Amino acid sequence: MARLNELYNKELVPQLMKDFNYRNIMQVPKLEKIVINMGLGEAIQNVKILDSAVSEMALIAGQKPVITKAKKSIAGFKLRQGMPIGCAVTLRREKMYEFLDRLINVSLPRVRDFKGISGKGFDGKGNYSLGVKEQLIFPEIDYDKIDKIKGLNITIVTSAKNDEEGKALLKLMGMPFRN
């Protein structure tokens, strides 16, 4: 069992039940999934960029990403419907907890001038999104094998009903929010 999952079951559930006066254990918010997305507009001109992005994403997430395609054509961007423009991974269960643990304890502290993550990334329903400017913060990525610095979006989907519950859950898991 992943370390964060154990922490959640043993310590966080009773703590959240006390803090929010839940009567039933099923009311306690929990992590549902983590979606990692890398959008690559440059893939329109050079499809080879997508291959390196897919391999890097597989190293970061620990599972093979799916290639995302354009939903509609946009002439201004020279984009046609169905063209590959990025990749995404959805993590659930053990891999989700292991990724979040690595993100909180290893990757985020490696960000330059890191003072904590913004508390404004919540969507109103308890889900949190954050952007990472470069994939080099992940220890799985070898600096010498990088051809281009790419950013990625990480969305943490919780079963929380509002932002307050979602933030409390993530804060107790160790997410370093800015005050």
From Swiss-Prot:
Transmembrane segments: none
GO biological process: translation
Top-rank taxon: Bacteria
Signal peptide extent: none
SUPFAM superfamilies linked to this entry: RL5-like
Any one cellular-component term (Gene Ontology): ribosome
Keyword terms, alphabetized: Ribonucleoprotein, Ribosomal protein, RNA-binding, rRNA-binding, tRNA-binding
Pfam families listed in its UniProt record: Ribosomal_L5, Ribosomal_L5_C
Quaternary organization: Part of the 50S ribosomal subunit; part of the 5S rRNA/L5/L18/L25 subcomplex. Contacts the 5S rRNA and the P site tRNA. Forms a bridge to the 30S subunit in the 70S ribosome.
Family to which this protein belongs: Belongs to the universal ribosomal protein uL5 family.
Described purpose of this protein according to its UniProt entry: This is one of the proteins that bind and probably mediate the attachment of the 5S RNA into the large ribosomal subunit, where it forms part of the central protuberance. In the 70S ribosome it contacts protein S13 of the 30S subunit (bridge B1b), connecting the 2 subunits; this bridge is implicated in subunit movement. Contacts the P site tRNA; the 5S rRNA and some of its associated proteins might help stabilize positioning of ribosome-bound tRNAs.
Name of protein: Large ribosomal subunit protein uL5
Biological source species: Geotalea daltonii (strain DSM 22248 / JCM 15807 / FRC-32)
Gene: rplE
